[in-house]
Swiss-Prot record:
This is Transcriptional repressor NrdR. Belongs to the NrdR family. GO terms for biological process: negative regulation of DNA-templated transcription. A zinc finger (unnamed) spans 3-34. Residues 49-139 form the ATP-cone domain. Residues 167-176 have a biased composition (Polar residues). InterPro entries: ATP-cone_dom, NrdR-like_N, RNR_NrdR-like. Binds 1 zinc ion. It comes from the Bacteria. Keywords: ATP-binding, DNA-binding, Metal-binding, Nucleotide-binding, Repressor, Transcription, Transcription regulation, Zinc, Zinc-finger.
Length: 176
């Protein structure tokens, strides 16, 4: 390791410890030429993953963008920030383990939906509504039917009954 002060290439390691939750190693070094101390970090180098969007544009995978989308879908669902971070960590780990360096936004979205399904039905439907570009109530009903068929969680029995509008029209007469 080259000394940042005198550019000498020999140094000795004084101390090593895990850093950043085990994602890197922090090393305290001493230059053998000038005897000054400096710190280095060793990190795992991940190969960048490219996301192919619907319009065929390509952009680098952005973990924070995915986390923001998931967090928006999970607002007021009771899921913790730690659960959301873990979900995004799992998706990112799956991407890194694949031999392919490009992934479609469809594959990415389906991976998120699979994980959300077991965490929160509400978050699942919210994320699906944006990701799958729901156009109307039928799209929501289809998503709810898929959840019901998967059997991963109880859905309200009200979905088993056809909707009937039993409200009577109200006529307001104002005095003149």
């Amino acid at each position: 390791m080259q000394c940042p002060f005198c550019q000498h290439t020999d140094s000795r390691v004084l101390e090593s410890r895990s850093a950043e939750a085990g994602q890197s190693v922090r090393r305290r070094r001493e230059c053998l030429q000038c005897n000054r101390r400096f710190t280095t970090y060793e990190r795992i180098e991940f190969v960048p993953i490219t996301v192919i969007k619907r319009n065929q544009d390509r952009e680098l995978f952005d973990r924070s963008k995915l986390l923001k989308g998931v967090a928006t879908a999970c607002e007021k669902t009771g899921l913790t920030a730690l659960q959301l971070e873990s979900l995004v960590d799992d998706v990112e780990a799956e991407l890194q383990q694949q031999a392919v360096r490009e992934v479609t936004s469809t594959e990415l979205g389906e991976s998120v939906l699979t994980k959300l399904q077991s965490l929160s039905e509400v978050a699942y439907v919210r994320f699906a509504s944006v990701y799958r570009q729901f156009r109307g109530i039928r799209d929501f009903v289809e998503a709810l039917d898929q959840l019901k068929e998967s059997g991963d969680g109880p859905l309200p029995s009200v979905l088993d009954e056809p909707y009937e509008d039993t409200a009577q029209p109200t006529i307001m007469i104002s005095p003149q």
